[in-house]
């Protein structure tokens, strides 16, 4: 029972998501090859929220603990959705229904296939705190040289990250993805979808302990990012002893406040109170 609030919280975030697809024709081809079923329906957007459906959308029906998205198939059809991704076909709706074992898993597989078309740096950022601010800082720096694709809002979950990836287009030359976690295995799952080339773990702290149970489980969950970067680069915050102790399988680049780091910070407190 103690995990129910976490599941409900995660579901409430997922049900508020919608994107426009940059390449509907390309999406249809990738979807057809990945799901391996006939698919000739034009889809211009994807949503998990029945209230946000727009004409031409693919509606992803998610069955949660308290709300089952399958109960809204008639409504999304009336609002102009072209089709729905479901795990149970409803005879009460005339909308085109694509049956899969798990709609969230299916859209994750499609997103991975979509991501694999792009041979660009994909930087994953996770941590107990500071994910969004770090993402924005990295985005700001890289924008001087790259056309950056990045996570927006709370799109850092098992449904939000796939939707973020499906907004990648040929104009992008780098991607920055925020990854959130609330239980063991979440980051490994997101890495399997995103296939990152670089990774940053901001810190490891006792956040969302109700889902993890211990700080050690948090470290294991976040540390999956570095383990997944066999041929990539892990940026290690050496100032955090838990992050510094994580196993790195690829290239390791450390940063922090000590001279032993590969990139030590040189901070100075000025007389006016500013830090340079």
Q: Positions of the model-derived regions?
A:
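Phosphate-binding loop of NTP-binding sites
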Residues: 13, 22, 106-238, 242-251
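Adenine nucleotide phosphate-binding catalytic loops in nucleotide-utilizing enzymes
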Residues: 215-216, 248-276
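Nucleotide phosphate-binding/pyrophosphate-handling subdomain across enzymes
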Residues: 52, 189, 271
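Short beta-strand micro-motifs in enzyme catalytic cores
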Residues: 96, 121, 273-275
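Short, polar loop motifs at secondary-structure junctions
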Residues: 84-91, 238-242, 257-258
């Amino acid at each position: 029972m103690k995990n129910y609030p976490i599941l409900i919280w995660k579901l409430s975030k997922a049900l508020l998501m919608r994107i426009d697809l940059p390449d509907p024709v390309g999406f249809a081809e990738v979807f057809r090859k990945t799901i391996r079923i006939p698919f000739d329906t034009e889809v211009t957007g994807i949503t998990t929220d029945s209230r946000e459906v727009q004409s031409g959308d693919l509606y992803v029906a998610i069955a949660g603990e308290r709300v089952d998205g399958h109960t809204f198939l008639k409504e999304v059809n009336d609002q102009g959705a072209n089709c729905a991704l479901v795990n149970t076909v409803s005879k009460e709706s005339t909308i085109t229904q694509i049956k899969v074992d798990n709609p969230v898993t299916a859209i994750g597989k499609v997103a991975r296939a979509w991501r694999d078309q792009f041979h660009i740096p994909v930087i994953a950022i996770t941590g107990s705190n500071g994910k969004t601010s770090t993402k924005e800082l990295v985005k700001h720096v890289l924008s001087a040289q790259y056309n950056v694709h990045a996570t927006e809002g709370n799109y850092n979950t098992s449904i939000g990250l796939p939707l973020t990836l499906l907004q990648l287009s040929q104009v992008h030359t780098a991607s920055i993805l925020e990854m959130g976690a609330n239980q063991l295995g979440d980051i490994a799952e997101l890495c399997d979808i995103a296939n990152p080339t670089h990774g940053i773990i901001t810190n490891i702290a006792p956040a969302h302990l109700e889902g993890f149970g211990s700080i050690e489980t948090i470290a294991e969950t976040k540390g999956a990012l570095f383990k997944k970067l066999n041929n990539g680069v892990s940026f290690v915050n050496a100032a955090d002893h838990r992050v510094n102790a994580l196993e790195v399988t690829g290239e390791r680049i450390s940063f922090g406040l000590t001279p032993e780091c590969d990139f030590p910070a040189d901070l100075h407190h000025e007389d006016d109170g500013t830090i340079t």
